[in-house]
Amino acid sequence: MTIYSKIIGTGSYLPPNRVTNQELTAQLASNGIETSDEWIVSRSGISARHYADAGVQSSDLAVEAAKRALEMAKLGVDDVDLIILATSTPDFFGGFPSTACVVQRKLGITNDCAAVDVQAVCSGFVYAVSIADNFIKAGTHKNVLVIGAEVFSRIIDFEDRTTCVLFGDGAGAVLMTASQEPGVLATKLHANGNYGDILCLPGKVSKGVVEGSAFLYMDGPAVFKLAVSVLDKVAHEALEIAGMQSSEVDWIIPHQANIRIMQSTAKKLGLGMDKMIVTVDQHGNTSAASIPMALDVGVRDGRIKPGQNVMMEGVGGGFTWGAVLARM
């Protein structure tokens, strides 16, 4: 009997502090940084973002999204036998204990299930789903909780208008389970460390002292050029693995980073924007959280229906990129 992995629950969470472009523009202006709603929207498509309050960690956002995914899947916390959490903003400096372990504790899971973090920045969720898919198909795990959670507001430089207007905080989650029905149809992952310096957090720690910048750095034009190229290729690779054509894709959910990159992705696949779930305008770039958040929106508002084929693709620092083609 062939075992497949299938997404049976989705969930998402945004912290309540919503900051519009107008509000952020006013805040930046008070510090001598000039920008405008028109400038932000024209370059990114972003109208607002959400920021976590002080003391709220990635794990707190992750727990809320996970609860909603479990509720949709009609599973209890101790039905989970593996947690894979994608984040670039872990609860603890240095990354341990892992944020996945913190989420396990906060959810009240008592079965000693495996828990691990994945770090591939904005590609993290796609990487995590691919890992979960392989664990399930191998028969070692049945119910896997996959989460993307970020508090990027902690690592952006509010004196750099080219990046501080783009990012926000949030979390998204899916519950993947073993199934006799096809679910995940194909996954494909890539990385190229030669491009590591175009999107990075360059600071290093030596004996408790940060050497270099502790804020995110991004070469916007270089990221745009590379992202458009690799997203097109990896989507077609996933389709080839599944033996499908782009016309069979019902919905495309790219990493919600920049509307211009997303438009280019749809065009190169020969799909209209009416086939794309777009949420970037409401929460900005939430890194590893953006794809599962958009997926959850599409499922809950009824656009994404059972049996439909969804292409999810991400690109992020490292440089990393990947795609997942799944039947819902």
UniProtKB/Swiss-Prot annotation:
Keyword annotations for this protein? Acyltransferase, Cytoplasm, Fatty acid biosynthesis, Fatty acid metabolism, Lipid biosynthesis, Lipid metabolism, Multifunctional enzyme, Transferase
GO MF terms held by the record: 3-oxoacyl-[acyl-carrier-protein] synthase activity; beta-ketoacyl-acyl-carrier-protein synthase III activity
Q: Which GO terms describe its biological process?
A: fatty acid biosynthetic process
InterPro entries, sorted:
ACP_syn_III_C, ACP_syn_III_N, FabH, Thiolase-like
Give the matching Pfam families: ACP_syn_III (PF08545), ACP_syn_III_C (PF08541)
One GO cellular component term noted in the UniProt record for this chain = cytoplasm
User: How is the quaternary structure described?
Assistant: Homodimer.
- Under what name is this protein listed? Beta-ketoacyl-[acyl-carrier-protein] synthase III
Q: Which organism is it from?
A: Janthinobacterium sp. (strain Marseille)
